[in-house]
């Protein structure tokens, strides 16, 4: 069985050397990797370039969030990296700046709607007058208006996001869902998790599945188990 390009494995590991070792262990079972903030300060871009050179796809999950001018300058540099996906926060000014900077490059911009670790109670505590579902709906509509390529949301809001995108005439809109947990794994700190099959049926285009794979005794075997769950959907 070969890798499924819809499966993204996050390299949320302490060091770049740890990440390289994990990639080696996973071998041909995984073709798409996410590099997040943990590796940003320790040559994460060097790792990204090396993985791209070896034929892997790369998701830079850096969640850019700053004034428009700063986001635009940062995204313009990243657009030359050859990486495939970049996250920004789902605020109109931020999304517009990233889309402008991306230009004609192959980099696709994803807007982060609501973190999968947050509950409705958390949002109230943060001062939002929305449930997670309502806030995701608002941000998906804003993301479509700003011209980003897709969004990041929990599997529980994937069907809503897909419906909104289809109604807007954008069936190709990307929906990347973290918080994917196979039935045989623990949920960890994901408050709104779902199985790989359920997330895909809800309309997700890509799944981010981390600890069930990277913390397994045999990461390659765990990755192939997830790929098997995804097969045919």
Curated annotation (Swiss-Prot):
The keyword Lyase applies. It catalyses: orotidine 5'-phosphate + H(+) = UMP + CO2. InterPro entries: Aldolase_TIM, OMPdecase, OMPdecase_AS, OMPdecase_bac, OMPdeCOase_dom, RibuloseP-bd_barrel. The keyword Acetylation does not apply. GO terms for cellular component: cytosol. It holds the Pfam family OMPdecase. This is Orotidine 5'-phosphate decarboxylase. It comes from Caulobacter vibrioides (strain NA1000 / CB15N). The gene is pyrF.
